[in-house]
C-alpha cells in the first residue's frame, strides 16, 4: 500500500487542525487550541487505489517557524491553507510556498491552495483572487469548510493526485536520463 506524506501549512487560526480532524475523525472542532505539531494517519481509497495518508498538521504561529524546515523536508505534498475571511493569511501563502520550494530545492513541489471557512457569510478574499494565485503557481485551488465538511475530502485527495502526477513525471524523466546514458561513444 502506498503511503503519502502530506503536510498542512498556513497561518495560525486558518483551520488547519479543523480540516485535518474533519478528514480523519469526521467531526468539527470548534475551540481554537494552537497546534505545535500533530500527526494523523488514515487509510483511504482514492481513484480505486487503497493508500495510507500520513498527515502532519503544523503550527501556524511564528514562534514555531524553526520547525518548518524539518517537516518540509519530509513532506511529499503540501496543503497551503488560508481563511477566506483573513486577508493576511492569504498573503502569507506566498511565504510558505517560497519556503517549501527553498527547502525542497525545487520549483515543482505538489501543492494545493485551500481557502477554508467558506461557510462564513463575510469574506475578505475573493474566490477569483485565490483562483488567479493558484493559476499563477500552476496548482489546484479548492474552497473548504471544516465546519460543514464541504471540500475537505476533495482537498486532501486532490493533493494525493498531484503527488501521483509528480512521481509519474519524475520516473519518466529518470527513464529518459537512463536511456541517454546508454549511448555508446566511439573514438576515432
UniProtKB/Swiss-Prot annotation:
Organism field: Cyprinus carpio
One Pfam family in the UniProt entry: Ras
GO cellular component, one term: cytoplasm
Function: Ras proteins bind GDP/GTP and possess intrinsic GTPase activity. Plays an important role in the regulation of cell proliferation. May play a role in promoting oncogenic events by inducing transcriptional silencing of tumor suppressor genes (TSGs).
Record-listed E.C. numbers: 3.6.5.2
Residues modified as Cysteine methyl ester: 185
Name the record gives this protein: GTPase KRas
InterPro entries documented for this protein: P-loop_NTPase, Small_GTP-bd, Small_GTPase, Small_GTPase_Ras-type
GO molecular function: G protein activity; GTP binding
Encoding gene, per UniProt annotation: kras
Start and end residues of each stretch annotated as Disordered: 167-188
Motif (Effector region): 32-40
Top-level lineage group: Eukaryota
Gene3D superfamilies to which the protein is assigned, alphabetical: P-loop containing nucleotide triphosphate hydrolases
Predominant cellular place of this UniProt entry's protein: membrane
Residues reported to bind GTP: 10-18, 29-35, 59-60, 116-119
Record comment: activity regulation: Alternates between an inactive form bound to GDP and an active form bound to GTP. Activated by a guanine nucleotide-exchange factor (GEF) and inactivated by a GTPase-activating protein (GAP).
Subcellular location field: Cell membrane; Cytoplasm
CDD domains assigned to the protein according to its UniProt record, in alphabetical order: H_N_K_Ras_like (cd04138)
Prosegment location in residue numbers: 186-188
Amino acid at each position: 500500500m502506498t503511503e503519502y506524506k502530506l503536510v498542512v501549512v498556513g497561518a495560525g487560526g486558518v483551520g488547519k487542525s479543523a480540516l485535518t480532524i474533519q478528514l480523519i475523525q469526521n467531526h468539527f472542532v470548534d475551540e481554537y487550541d494552537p497546534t505545535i505539531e500533530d500527526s494523523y494517519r488514515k487509510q483511504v481509497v482514492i481513484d480505486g487505489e487503497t493508500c495510507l495518508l500520513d498527515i502532519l498538521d503544523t503550527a501556524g504561529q511564528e514562534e514555531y517557524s524553526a520547525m518548518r524546515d524539518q517537516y518540509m523536508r519530509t513532506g511529499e505534498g503540501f496543503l497551503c491553507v488560508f481563511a477566506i475571511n483573513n486577508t493576511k493569511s492569504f498573503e502569507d501563502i506566498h511565504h510558505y510556498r517560497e519556503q517549501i520550494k527553498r527547502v525542497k530545492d525545487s520549483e515543482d513541489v505538489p501543492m494545493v491552495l485551500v481557502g477554508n471557512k467558506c461557510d462564513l457569510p463575510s469574506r475578505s478574499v475573493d474566490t477569483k483572487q485565490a483562483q488567479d494565485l493558484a493559476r499563477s503557481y500552476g496548482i489546484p485551488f479548492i474552497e473548504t469548510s471544516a465546519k460543514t465538511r464541504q471540500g475537505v475530502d476533495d482537498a486532501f485527495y486532490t493533493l494525493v493526485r498531484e503527488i501521483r502526477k509528480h512521481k509519474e513525471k519524475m520516473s519518466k524523466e529518470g527513464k529518459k536520463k537512463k536511456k541517454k546514458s546508454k549511448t555508446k561513444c566511439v573514438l576515432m
